[in-house]
Amino acid sequence: MGRGARVPSEAPGAGVERRWLGAALVALCLLPALVLLARLGAPAVPAWSAAQGDVAALGLSAVPPTRVPGPLAPRRRRYTLTPARLRWDHFNLTYRILSFPRNLLSPRETRRALAAAFRMWSDVSPFSFREVAPEQPSDLRIGFYPINHTDCLVSALHHCFDGPTGELAHAFFPPHGGIHFDDSEYWVLGPTRYSWKKGVWLTDLVHVAAHEIGHALGLMHSQHGRALMHLNATLRGWKALSQDELWGLHRLYGCLDRLFVCASWARRGFCDARRRLMKRLCPSSCDFCYEFPFPTVATTPPPPRTKTRLVPEGRNVTFRCGQKILHKKGKVYWYKDQEPLEFSYPGYLALGEAHLSIIANAVNEGTYTCVVRRQQRVLTTYSWRVRVRG
């Protein structure tokens, strides 16, 4: 994840990048942006767990605050799922912290920040998260790493970090579970802001961690401007989970009630009287799961022909599109099985301006299509069907 508007190499789950930052931030022309960033941010969602045995402690007379916005008017889908809809097969996830940041934050503060980020998701979903010792097995593995870390030098689709003021973090889609933070950054508890004294950006760990956790759960970037999973969430400062993320989780994991008393509460009229609480705990009983009509997948012109490629498992495959017509100022759009591909996903595929590279495996099997458009006119279309040979 990063602060810039650049398309990221989303970790095998994802990451956001900031490219417009650098050493020249002392320029006075950036003062308005710095003042804006200094005002961004909000405290993390308070811890609150609704276990089956804690019903009496919920205190329905006082509705706990929630970050979920009210109902929205019907609109088009803005969240994005992974092309293969990768997801976890259980909701009780464990995580371990393999390394801590070397700048500013202590291990204790780091644990507090990560716990707050996990609560943002557990408070609005069936997921629960529990930290385990570093030597124990876990679903999620979190670490703060230097530029060259793990297998980034030998993996074609897992990129290395780029030092300060570049990529902040990246995460891997399920079931990999890796969440990597750039140890060159200056992580803090509190809003992202620029430090004139240190001459560096101080980055809100809770905010970035919550974004990367969304990727680790299977969500890609949202097109909703105020979504936590938006590409520029760090720059814009939106720290609350939007309805977009909840709809994405519902489509990926199903719309589930979190308490066994939800049906009873719904019959007593709590769906209207305690709408926010019920939307968080009892979306199925109150029929809050899908409040707008889900569209069909993005339409793509049928390619005149589709080439089938049988590829050995593990091989890197590259498709090239529109090389001869780029001078006509056309824009290239990529699709997998008719679902639009907007970003790179390290560990799965790398998306360039006019080329697409994938690692041949069971997840990446399917039909890839590129469409070159100039405004509303389609200039050309190519399609490849990939089958993996074991």
Swiss-Prot record:
The active site is at 212. It is an enzyme of class 3 (hydrolase). The gene is MMP23B. It is found in: Endoplasmic reticulum membrane; Membrane. Residues 295-380 form the Ig-like C2-type domain. Residues 1-19 are cytoplasmic. Gene3D superfamilies: 1.10.10.1940, Collagenase (Catalytic Domain), Immunoglobulins. Changing residue 78 to G: Abolishes processing of soluble form. One of its GO terms (cellular component) is extracellular space. Glycans are attached at residues 92, 148, 232, 316. It is a single-pass type II membrane protein. PANTHER family: MATRIX METALLOPROTEINASE (PTHR10201), MATRIX METALLOPROTEINASE-23 (PTHR10201:SF7). Pfam families: Peptidase_M10, ShK. Its cofactor is Zn(2+). This is Matrix metalloproteinase-23. Zn(2+) binds at residues 211, 215, 221. One of its GO terms (molecular function) is zinc ion binding. GO terms for biological process: collagen catabolic process; extracellular matrix organization; proteolysis. Binds 1 zinc ion per subunit. Residues 1-78 form a propeptide. Predominantly expressed in ovary, testis and prostate. N-glycosylated. Inhibited by TIMP2. Belongs to the peptidase M10A family. Residues 255-289 form the ShKT domain.
